Amino acid sequence: MSGRGKGGKGLGKGGAKRHRKVLRDNIQGITKPAIRRLARRGGVKRISGLIYEETRGVLKVFLENVIRDAVTYTEHAKCKTVTAMDVVYALKRQGRTLYGFGG
C-alpha cells in the first residue's frame, strides 16, 4: 500500500485538478413545458406567465439546500461519491422524508 488511504489504487498520483467548466444559467434547462408538466401533475389548470422564473428560483434554492446537506454527509463519511442515502438523509433532515431508496 502506498499510504494513500482507502480507494487509493489506480487513481494516479492525485496531481493538479483539471480546469472544470464554470456552470452558468443551467437553471434555464428547466424548461417552460417541464414546469407546466409538474404543475399539471399537481392539479393546476391554468398558469400565469410569471410563474416560470419564480419556480426556477424556488427550485434552485431548494436543490442548493438539499445538495449542501448531502455533500456534508458525504464529506463526513470521508467519501467522494454522493450516494442515494446521503440525499435521503439530507431530505429527512429538512423534514421531507423520502421512501424507496434504501435505509
Swiss-Prot record:
It comes from Aplysia californica (California sea hare). CDD domains: HFD_H4. GO terms for cellular component: nucleosome; nucleus. The modification N-acetylserine is found at residue 2. The modification N6-acetyl-N6-methyllysine is found at residues 6, 13. Core component of nucleosome. Nucleosomes wrap and compact DNA into chromatin, limiting DNA accessibility to the cellular machineries which require DNA as a template. Histones thereby play a central role in transcription regulation, DNA repair, DNA replication and chromosomal stability. DNA accessibility is regulated via a complex set of post-translational modifications of histones, also called histone code, and nucleosome remodeling. Signal peptide: none annotated. SMART domains: H4. The modification N6-acetyllysine is found at residue 17. The modification N6-methyllysine is found at residue 21. It comes from the Eukaryota. Residues 1-14 have a biased composition (Gly residues). Keywords: Acetylation, Chromosome, DNA-binding, Methylation, Nucleosome core, Nucleus. GO terms for molecular function: DNA binding; protein heterodimerization activity; structural constituent of chromatin. PANTHER family: HISTONE H4. The gene is His.H4. It is found in: Nucleus; Chromosome. Belongs to the histone H4 family. This is Histone H4. Residues 1-20 are annotated as: Disordered. The nucleosome is a histone octamer containing two molecules each of H2A, H2B, H3 and H4 assembled in one H3-H4 heterotetramer and two H2A-H2B heterodimers. The octamer wraps approximately 147 bp of DNA. Residues 17-21 bind DNA.
